[in-house]
Curated annotation (Swiss-Prot):
This is Ribosome assembly protein 3. It comes from the Eukaryota. Residues 76-85 have a biased composition (Polar residues). The keyword rRNA-binding does not apply.
Length: 191
């Protein structure tokens, strides 16, 4: 086989060169006394072809035999940290003092008992927000219609422009307000 590789080298086949280099690398690992020059590696390759060297058998390593203590160490360290961060238990005297402290009350805490009133308030707030949003969308539509009035006039003159086209165009312009948050939309409308 070595003779076949020499013939391939003379031809200039790049695949054989790659294979030969690969083989050289594996032999370089097996012998430490060889130099890295190409002439000495060629000689060592010829020697290897003549005398097969016995491969040292590596003892198979069983993963179960490996003892890993790092998990145990981290568990111990984390328990120590948790113990140091835990507050000391409160005495009975401290519990009594804490229970005697009166909590402050406000209008919100006193109203919390009536759930019907809070539901009505929430519904009213939702309705008010919906009205304000509709009003804001309509104002945005008027702003866009005035900005694009010349373009809209040209579209109306087209033969394929119908009432449905007008409604579709108005909804499209109005839905453009959804890309802004309310503060930005208010700022645009105020300009």
């Amino acid at each position: 086989m070595a003779a076949a590789q020499v013939k391939n080298e003379k031809i200039g086949n790049p695949k054989s060169n790659r294979r030969r280099r690969k083989k050289r690398r594996t032999e370089d690992f097996s012998s430490d006394s060889e130099s890295s020059s190409s002439s000495s590696s060629d000689e060592s390759m010829d020697d290897a072809a003549e005398e097969p060297k016995p491969i040292k058998e590596t003892k198979s390593i069983n993963i179960d035999d490996i003892d890993i203590d790092s998990d145990k160490e981290t568990d111990v360290n984390s328990q120590e940290k948790q113990n140091s961060l835990r507050p000391e238990p409160l005495s009975n005297e401290t519990h009594e003092k804490l229970s005697n402290i009166k909590l402050t009350t406000s209008k919100l805490t006193s109203v919390g008992g009536s759930s019907k009133n809070s539901n009505i308030d929430i519904n009213q707030v939702k309705k008010t927000l919906a009205k304000d949003k509709d009003q804001l969308n309509n104002e945005y539509l008027m702003l866009m219609a005035s900005s694009f009035s010349n373009d809209l006039d040209e579209l109306r003159k087209k033969p394929d422009f119908t009432d449905k086209s007008l409604v579709l165009l108005a909804k499209t312009l109005q839905s453009g307000s959804n890309m802004f948050d309310e503060e930005t939309l208010n700022a645009i409308l105020e300009q």
